[in-house]
């Protein structure tokens, strides 16, 4: 059942990492025209309609009440996630400190105008965005399913070193120490 690569005998298709999802988020801090602009920008960059995020609790210092719309996000999966990362990863400088214990990582893009499809418009301004990438191995659904769920064995869990190697080889980016 196992297939071996020409360079070594340790390749196994069930151990190959893959992208489960990519979440692109813009936190504005308040609703109104700025939030509508952010939603438009997210829609143009990702090709998918964003959903509004709401405040989880009231923060008096920032004049935010629980339930107020304060941001927008888009969740990308499969080919759309791959295409977005092809565009977004060259805009960011990744470090190993951005990877968590399970191989997921996040990075920020300071200006939306860095994307090739975007140009500066003085009436809109400049917005930054956060990108979170969730990496998994085949078989992770076992831990998430409702019936007969099991924990993932330690040797099958994704670690930061495997995630860095996957990102560097797949997207031709360099992850610094």
UniProtKB/Swiss-Prot annotation:
Q: Which GO terms describe its molecular function?
A: rRNA binding; structural constituent of ribosome; tRNA binding
Superkingdom assignment: Archaea
- What biological-process terms (Gene Ontology) are attached? translation
Question: A Pfam family name for this chain?
Answer: Ribosomal_L5
Q: Which GO terms describe its cellular component?
A: ribonucleoprotein complex; ribosome
Q: Which Gene3D superfamilies match?
A: 3.30.1440.10
Q: Give UniProt keywords alphabetically.
A: Ribonucleoprotein, Ribosomal protein, RNA-binding, rRNA-binding, tRNA-binding
**Which PROSITE patterns does UniProt cross-reference here?**
RIBOSOMAL_L5
Q: How does it assemble?
A: Part of the 50S ribosomal subunit. Interacts with protein L18 and the 5S rRNA, and probably with tRNAs. Forms a bridge to the 30S subunit in the 70S ribosome.
Record's family?
Belongs to the universal ribosomal protein uL5 family.
Q: Tell me, what does this protein do in biology? A: This is 1 of 5 proteins that mediates the attachment of the 5S rRNA onto the large ribosomal subunit, stabilizing the orientation of adjacent RNA domains. Forms part of the central protuberance. Modeling places the A and P site tRNAs in close proximity to this protein; the 5S rRNA and some of its associated proteins might help stabilize positioning of ribosome-bound tRNAs. In the 70S ribosome it is thought to contact protein S13 of the 30S subunit (bridge B1b), connecting the 2 subunits; this bridge is implicated in subunit movement.
User: What name is this protein filed under?
Assistant: Large ribosomal subunit protein uL5
